[in-house]
């Protein structure tokens, strides 16, 4: 449903703004990228622009397109990302070469912020536009991650910080927060550890 909604919004934006001046790929990240969105979810997305993009000439078009689609998703119930990881943010609306530079830096300099970003942007999935831009990014990034053992070890260490809701005796470890006592956060204590593990194994295999 989210993919169909996004593509309809892209088509509406094209009718309003005209055809895109350079090729682009609209890409979903996070839970939408992994096809695991729940009923209550925010939006994570980005734009990969062709390297022929020039900010002075084409910037206004893609800013307007991103704003239209992100606003439309919010109106449909896919609320704005609290971390601003959306195509409407100029940081995540850049050329293919800039995306390749982002990933190269995150992989070769895996500080805590880089690891946080990779947990979002390694889970990308093409939604609309020119698919070859997305494929080119994957072909560049996956081999780079696969052969960097230091990066993968940092990803493993980061994954181990997200623990399942189990105590030392194998029983359930309940949430002790006053607002929701005797509860379990299924996202952070069940889904995230599995996703983190799957991501590490996938990157190690170049998938």
Q: Model-derived features: where do they sit?
A:
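Generic structural "secondary-structure junction" signal
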Residues: 41, 105, 123-124, 171-174, ...
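Cation-handling catalytic/transport regions enriched in His/Asp/Glu
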Residues: 26-27, 34-39, 45, 51, ...
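Conserved nucleotidyltransferase catalytic core and NTase-mimicking acidic/glycine-rich helix/loop elements
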Residues: 22-23, 129-207
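Secondary-structure capping and boundary motifs in well-ordered enzyme cores
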Residues: 28, 32-39, 61, 65, ...
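Conserved catalytic core of two-metal-ion nucleotidyltransferases
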Residues: 1-8, 16-23, 56-119, 132-140
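Active-site nucleotide-donor binding segment shared across nucleotidyl transfer reactions
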Residues: 2-58
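Feature representing long, continuous alpha-helical segments
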Residues: 47, 67, 71, 192-195, ...
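N-terminal intrinsically disordered, cationic/polar leader segments
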Residues: 119-129
